Regions:
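A short beta-loop-alpha structural element at the N-terminal edge
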Residues: 2-16
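Conserved GNAT-fold acetyl-CoA-binding loop/helix
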Residues: 22-42
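Conserved beta-strand in the GNAT
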Residues: 55, 62-73
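Conserved acyl-donor/pantetheine-binding loop and adjacent beta-alpha core of acyl/acetyltransferases
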Residues: 68-102
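Conserved acetyl-CoA-binding loop-helix of GNAT-fold acetyltransferases
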Residues: 99-116, 133-138
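Conserved GNAT acetyl-CoA-binding A-motif
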Residues: 117-128
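Conserved catalytic-core motifs of GNAT/GCN5-like acyltransferases
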Residues: 124, 142-155
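Conserved active-site alpha-helix within GNAT-family acetyltransferase domains
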Residues: 128-146
Length: 155
């Protein structure tokens, strides 16, 4: 698997992956995360333009997953409740990690790529996203506390 920047021509497949991810979340008990068409095509276009959107591709170049990776402070991480960050060092943030569900190891490939770029990585997920929580725990992430994202929901 390889990671590369998302190109605008990838947008239809990336949006299909997010459609699949929303349906998967609903089917696994996560009914309140990524609602109302989130993430929107406009948001992903902006992330492509900003150089923050990436895709994970298979041996034939097929897109298997997508995510956002941003180096630098995330405004939603400035306040943490019922806990504390592990350190105050500069960090990278992973957002909107999703796969098409057709191949194992895609999430891990994306996480590996992020850690190769920056050793201090933060990620948040919804309390009902048990699948992502399992992946993050397996990968060695530790729960640090609660943050609130832009729409006011807890992570």
């Amino acid at each position: 698997m390889e990671i590369r920047p998302t190109e605008i021509k990838d947008l239809p497949l990336v949006m299909e992956i997010y459609d699949y991810a929303r349906a998967f979340m609903r089917a696994t008990g996560n009914t309140t995360q990524w609602i109302d068409g989130y993430p929107s095509e406009a948001l992903i276009c902006q992330e492509i333009e900003d150089g923050h959107s990436f895709v994970c591709t298979g041996e034939q170049g097929e897109i298997l997953g997508t995510f956002c990776f941003i180096l630098g402070e995330d405004p939603t991480y400035q306040q943490i409740y019922k806990g504390a960050w592990l350190n105050d060092e500069p960090y990278g943030v992973i957002h909107r990690l999703a796969t098409n569900g057709k191949q194992k190891g895609v999430s891990e490939a994306c996480l590996d790529w992020c850690f190769q770029r920056w050793p201090n990585v933060r990620v948040d997920t919804h309390r009902d996203n048990k699948v992502m929580q399992h992946i993050l725990t397996k990968y060695g992430f530790q729960r640090c506390g609660i943050i609130y994202v832009k729409n006011g929901t807890e992570r």
